[in-house]
Amino acid sequence: MKKAILIVSFGTTYPDTRQKNIAAIARQVRALYPDAVVEEAVSSTIVRNAMKKREHIEAKSPTEALESMKKQGVTHVAVFPTHVIDGIENHRLKEAAKKYAGAFEQIAVADALLAKPQDYEDVAKALWESLKEEVGDFPLILMGHGTEHAADASYAMMEQSLRAYAKHEIYIATVEGSITIKDVIARMKSGPQSRQNGKVLLTPFMLVAGDHANNDMAGGMQDGEQPDADSFAGKLQAAGYRPECVIRGIGEYPAV
């Protein structure tokens, strides 16, 4: 019997956050399972190509990693996705794994971060306990990726779980999902705890703080500049709020 673990992420073109989040997870897995073959894969072709061009790193796709394991004589594979929700990327990964069912004695794909009701409660506790000192009395907005998949509903469920645990004014807005930053701003202005002209804390609800966090969320604000008008920070500023950005992926929180 030869066991292996395949860690799959969408990937990021930001080396620093890759080390703090994805590589950190891989190090933990290798430490926990020293006898297993541990490989990493990047599901995004765009990210793989960028890593090769900019950093001369040959990142494997999930299929390439599974092929490598097959050649190494691996018999049992555990696929560990780092996806937050069970959306399009996670379903593609499951389909890729199914094609290798006959190549190994056993291959199994673990759940995404948010798969069961208890997951939401656990993540809510871990996130709030990690962030509450920075948040203080101010509203907190988490930026999720969002998706056309039905799993987009996970973000609203996560917001509810966070509010229930923290008893605090917390919102989740997405870049590509149904809940936009405009929706959140409207709720903030009409809600009983509306704090127009007040500070608002912005941080990613994503594994890594990469392109979306730096551009779609902060919009250049993290470099001391005025945020881009189309960014979350820019739209909050235009609505009369004072956004403060925490550029940190949730993979940096040990409790998560």
Identify the role of each PLM range.
Residues 1-256:
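Active-site-proximal alpha-helix that buttresses catalytic centers in soluble enzyme cores
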